[in-house]
């Protein structure tokens, strides 16, 4: 029997009694954000709204985005990436589980030197597929010219943020390239790999 989203106690400053809030609401108050599903317009808008709100609330404290995502739609993913670059606080990205496709694109968009992968995380990059856009009819449509422009956009970002040459990134994006956490670090997608059983990073 499903239990729904777990609730945790939270005491507002100046309040004597704690109230029960869902765990994500509580974590958001600590500036911890989660992308734990496919990237679509709904989760994209939620994360963008949270990043903007938390930036207005305090533009000096860093944000932390935990990613466990198989990817998803390109345009909503780019919207998350652009917001991460736009907001004043640094955005740490943390890969736990899988960051594939648009998940890896958002991962690489974290503040350089503040991108982390857990030891057993997996990262996958590839070129955008034609199912990035949902038409009103529910059918997926993409013009070849638009797909090429999107591929160029994603490739430029990977080149800029990984430090790899254009030919290396272009070659990698020809197919599904899966990486371990240490391989993703060597590839420049993350900067740090968490060390098990300690609070240190390598």
From Swiss-Prot:
**InterPro entries listed in its UniProt record:** ClpP, ClpP/crotonase-like_dom_sf, ClpP/TepA, ClpP_His_AS, ClpP_Ser_AS
Its Enzyme Commission number(s) read 3.4.21.92
Asked if the keyword Chloroplast belongs to this entry, the reply reads yes
Q: Which is one Pfam family of this protein?
A: CLP_protease
Signal peptide range equals none
Biological process according to GO: protein quality control for misfolded or incompletely synthesized proteins
Which reactions is this enzyme annotated as catalysing?
Hydrolysis of proteins to small peptides in the presence of ATP and magnesium. alpha-casein is the usual test substrate. In the absence of ATP, only oligopeptides shorter than five residues are hydrolyzed (such as succinyl-Leu-Tyr-|-NHMec, and Leu-Tyr-Leu-|-Tyr-Trp, in which cleavage of the -Tyr-|-Leu- and -Tyr-|-Trp bonds also occurs)
Entry's PROSITE patterns? Answer: CLP_PROTEASE_HIS, CLP_PROTEASE_SER
**Catalytic machinery residues:** 101 (nucleophile), 126
Query: EC class of this enzyme?
Result: hydrolase
Q: Which SUPFAM superfamilies match?
A: ClpP/crotonase
The protein's superkingdom reads Eukaryota
Give a GO molecular function annotation for the protein: serine-type endopeptidase activity
Question: Matching Gene3D superfamilies, A to Z?
Answer: 2-enoyl-CoA Hydratase, Chain A, domain 1 (3.90.226.10)
Family indicated by similarity: Belongs to the peptidase S14 family.
Q: Known PANTHER family for this protein? A: ATP-DEPENDENT CLP PROTEASE PROTEOLYTIC SUBUNIT (PTHR10381), CHLOROPLASTIC ATP-DEPENDENT CLP PROTEASE PROTEOLYTIC SUBUNIT 1 (PTHR10381:SF15)
Q: What is this protein called?
A: ATP-dependent Clp protease proteolytic subunit
Write down the species. Answer: Platanus occidentalis (Sycamore)
Q: What is the lineage of its organism?
A: Eukaryota, Viridiplantae, Streptophyta, Embryophyta, Tracheophyta
